A protein has these predicted regions:
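Charged substrate- and nucleic-acid-binding regions of tRNA-handling and nucleotidyl-transfer enzymes
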Residues: 91-162
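Conserved, hydrophobic alpha-helical core segments of structured domains
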Residues: 1-98
Length: 162
């Protein structure tokens, strides 16, 4: 009986590429990352394997995060890391054969705008505040995490346009 019957030739080849990518990036081997390489990028498969192997919640979450990998992941590595965390972003980039150097030594920033600041500008509490926060946060990510001053400009622009 196989331990990972979900693995096929493509996944074994992917593991070989991952081992090489880890070496090239001077990263220590990582068992969970390597297990993720042996699974197809299908969330229910990752969940089933995690349950069958009785993995911890953190390990399950990591496998499912990696299973959500996408061909667009490498376009904005730091945006990916902001969304899914550095560990999962690193896993996904390595599996994609993408450059991981943008994440080296980088810390995930905190979005520098709060809903209360929008309310203080005269917007009523509720869905409009949430919509503005989400729109400005998307722009902040797309602009590669500019300063708080730029975020305030974005807010001003959004309030002026809205």
């Amino acid at each position: 009986q196989e331990i990972l019957p979900e693995s096929g030739g493509r996944e074994v080849d992917q593991l070989a590429r991952l081992v090489e990518a880890e070496r090239d990036a001077a990263l220590a081997p990582d068992a969970m990352r390597r297990m993720a390489a042996l699974l197809p990028p299908i969330v229910p498969v990752a969940e089933a394997v995690a349950a069958r192997l009785r993995l911890s919640r953190a390990q399950r979450d990591r496998l499912t995060c990696v299973a959500r990998r996408d061909t667009e992941d490498a376009r904005h590595p730091r945006g990916l890391a902001y969304s899914v965390g550095i560990e999962c972003a690193l896993d996904r980039l390595l599996l994609a054969g993408a450059d991981t150097s943008p994440l080296k030594g980088w810390e995930v920033p905190v979005f520098p705008l709060k809903g209360g600041e929008i309310v203080a500008r005269g917007v009523a509490r509720g869905p409009e505040v949430a919509r503005l926060l989400q729109a400005i946060e998307r722009r902040w990510i797309d602009e590669h995490f500019p300063s708080r001053a730029r975020v305030v400009e974005m807010l001003d622009e959004s309030l002026h346009d809205g």
